[in-house]
Amino acid sequence: DVAPSRGLGDVYKRQVQLRNAEMCCEYIRPLFSDPKREEFYMIAMNDDYVPLKEIYIASGIPNRVQFDTHKLLRDAVASQCTCVVLAHNHPSGLAAASNADLLATQAIILALGQVGIDVLDHVILTPTNWFSMAEHGRVPQYNPGTGQLLFAARATWPMEPEKPKQIKR
């Protein structure tokens, strides 16, 4: 399913290029409507990191959400994306990845990797904060040659903006 009508407008989507985890969190946060239960979304993007579609995956109870990996895979392929960012919320306010979050992310990376779709990040939003699994080295890369996950360090984001340079006087 595509994100419900509270989603973001097509004009806005065409104008934004998501370059880092913070931009993804700001972009996706408006879709989270129920502060009492976990909700799970996926931002499907093209090679230029421009969102093609926000895809609603599932909602659950206050401390967990279950989802269908096959549905997630079908929706990602149907969007014709080349990469995605996963996003879910933690109503508890804990801005950290649980073991279940890490295992689910790995399963999704394996499934999407088999069809050539890269998972750039899995962000967790709380009412006041956010957590990027990629920025904490928790998003392995899919190796198409072996069909396995590579847990070696990887660049957090392909388009991370340069840090501002100090002007010397």
List where the protein language model places each region.
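Single conserved hydrophobic/aromatic residue that forms the stacking wall/gate
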Residues: D1-Y12
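Long, charged amphipathic helices and adjacent flexible linkers at domain junctions
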Residues: D10-E22
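Active-site-proximal loop/helix of nucleotide/amide-processing enzymes and allied scaffolds
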Residues: M23-E26, A58-G145, L150
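Short loop/turn motifs at secondary-structure junctions and domain boundaries
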Residues: S33-K36
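Short beta-strand scaffold segments in enzyme catalytic cores
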Residues: F40-A44, Y49, D121-I124
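Acidic, metal-coordinating catalytic segment for phosphate/diphosphate chemistry
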Residues: R154
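Non-Sec secretion/translocation targeting segments of pathogen effectors
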Residues: P161-R169
